[in-house]
A protein has these predicted regions:
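Hydrophobic alpha-helical membrane-insertion segments
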Residues: 11-25, 96-105
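Juxtamembrane helix-break-helix junctions at the cytosolic face
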Residues: 78-91
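Membrane-helix boundary/juxtamembrane motif in polytopic membrane proteins
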Residues: 88-99, 158-161
Length: 162
């Protein structure tokens, strides 16, 4: 049934993972306040800061695989949402989606670690909303799986009573 509570959580997974593609995941400013490095789902970009060079792109590296994984996770959540008649399949799809989101989170952390070592190893960058959207999506996925499992156990217990 579409009106179940896990539907809301699966929809929130899709929204959170799609927001990752539009939001900044990580950023860091060097100690001289002359450059800023930003990680999005599509690029790792170094910008110039200061007078006259504000916003000029100094270097850009494509990390499109984070964006692709985020879109795949959102699509899988929406597909899982449509599989409400087959709870076992829905739990399996959510398990696969958790794996994809975990890989996305791992790649994002790895990219931030690598960028931090190159850009400014003495200071840590700041994780932005895009990073926390991945974490929120994982939590929403776990909660939705819990409610799906609860429904499955309820159906099995009713079958036992018959």
């Amino acid at each position: 049934m579409i009106q179940r509570v896990q539907t809301i959580f699966l929809f929130l997974v899709a929204v959170a993972m799609l927001s990752v593609t539009a939001l900044t995941i990580w950023e860091q400013v060097n100690p001289d306040q002359t450059e800023q490095m930003t990680l999005t789902a599509w690029n790792l970009t170094t910008f110039a800061m200061g007078e006259g060079a504000e916003g000029a792109v100094l270097e850009q590296k494509g990390v499109y695989y984070i964006g692709i994984l985020a879109i795949v996770a959102a699509a899988l959540a929406l597909y899982s949402l449509s599989q409400f008649k087959n709870r076992t399949k829905q739990m399996f799809l959510n398990m696969i989606n958790s794996l994809i989101m975990g890989i996305t989170l791992g790649i994002a952390v790895f990219q931030t670690y690598q960028a931090n070592q190159v850009f400014n190893p003495t200071a840590q960058g700041v994780f932005a909303f895009g990073f926390y959207a991945i974490v929120a999506a994982i939590i929403f996925n776990v909660v939705s799986n819990r409610f799906i499992r609860k429904d499955e156990m309820l159906v099995k217990s009713v079958d036992r009573i018959r």
